[in-house]
Amino acid sequence: MTKKRLLVIAQELDPYTEDTYMANLIAKLPQFAQDKGGFELRVLMPKYGTINERRHRLHEVVRLSGMNIIIDDDDYPLVIKVASMPNSRMQVYFLENEDYFKRKFMFADENGKGFDDNHERMIFFSKAVLETVKKFGWAPDIIHCHGWLTSLVPLFVKEAYNHEPIFNHSTIIYSVYDENVLGALPENFAQKASINGMNQALLDPFIDGDQLNEKKGAFYYADAVIKGNETYSDAVTERIENLDKPVLEYQDKDTYLPQYIEFYKKLMGATEEE
């Protein structure tokens, strides 16, 4: 029987980024999904400037590198590197661009102020991930997005890459975490994010008054949602409760791995029945 394919898109991953709850949670998922769930895996994340290439033995994948990612008529070179996770044969692909990711901090400066171009970084990373998967020639059954940086992936798969056969049968899961990074709505957001000739009106679910609300938009376009944290703001909690799609409740560190695999398989079963 052909193995099902799981694409994990991570904004953080232990041991490559800071030791956070999200980074630790995601780190255990790929190996478990492969060994216990029987999945074939690909793991993609940004190549932040904070990642030590020598320590983690990153090397460039020449056959995948050399693409330019076009955002609002501007070209951004994409370099793809790979490394094996410690004590594992599991490979992680790192998406590198000097303009957006070669910095001393991940999401905010030394004073804790979020980078002004975080919304552009989200656009770039989301498009770069999908272009990389196309280059793989590898059609994912499940696309599991973790964190705000991946929030545009569900929209892009559904609307900007809807004519790409490689994504025709993908089920998209968005894991939402209790994080607030983006804030005020940049005036050029819809223009920049409407990639591949997409209608700007498709970005409306991401707009919440004068705020850029990546959770609201990701909830709208994802096929299913996983609660990565136990608690959220009242507004986020209410949005999750009102979703008319599958939601996996928060799972603690002892239960989340088998529960995620079961959730994947339920979603794939529902898709195959349609």
Give the residues covered by each predicted segment.
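Catalytic cores of nucleotide-sugar-dependent glycosyltransferases that transfer UDP/GDP/TDP-activated
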Residues: 1-274
